[in-house]
């Protein structure tokens, strides 16, 4: 089945491309989600009429993602968690925890945008975490995990000194 993509889809294609997909994927996912149209001559004409509008929407999303990436530059998130003597956490810090901490600090981040390629964080320490704001735009933040009985103020002062 051939479809016209109405937005960029990872591992499939970009806006406006006509691609071959399995019939079930096209009928049951891409078309109902509004991500593609069947590649009929009538739909090709409709798409060409809307191409500029769709490209403008994509450009706006890209600009918004760039703006959010600038806001996330040099962000240091300090989190506290219970841990044992050796620094191993009781539990773990995951994408939801990091997204919630960023949201509390005034930066709107969805948990699906937080990327932890090595899995959840299970040790006290500093970690660089990527935030994927758009297909091609990533922001890197520093997440510092302290023991719950650790001194948060000292860690904040240390982070400020490192930034200077």
Swiss-Prot record:
- What is a single molecular function from GO for this protein? rRNA binding
> Coiled-coil intervals in this record?
none
The GO cellular component terms are:
ribonucleoprotein complex; ribosome
Disulfide bond annotation, renumbered to this chain: none
Keyword hit for Ribonucleoprotein: yes
Q: Which UniProt keywords apply?
A: Ribonucleoprotein, Ribosomal protein, RNA-binding, rRNA-binding
**NCBIfam families in UniProt:** L9
Family of the protein in this entry = Belongs to the bacterial ribosomal protein bL9 family.
Function, in words: Binds to the 23S rRNA.
* PANTHER family named in the record: 50S RIBOSOMAL PROTEIN L9
Name used for this protein in its record? Large ribosomal subunit protein bL9
**Species per Swiss-Prot/TrEMBL record:** Psychrobacter sp. (strain PRwf-1)
The organism's taxonomy opens as: Bacteria, Pseudomonadati, Pseudomonadota, Gammaproteobacteria, Moraxellales
The protein's gene is named rplI
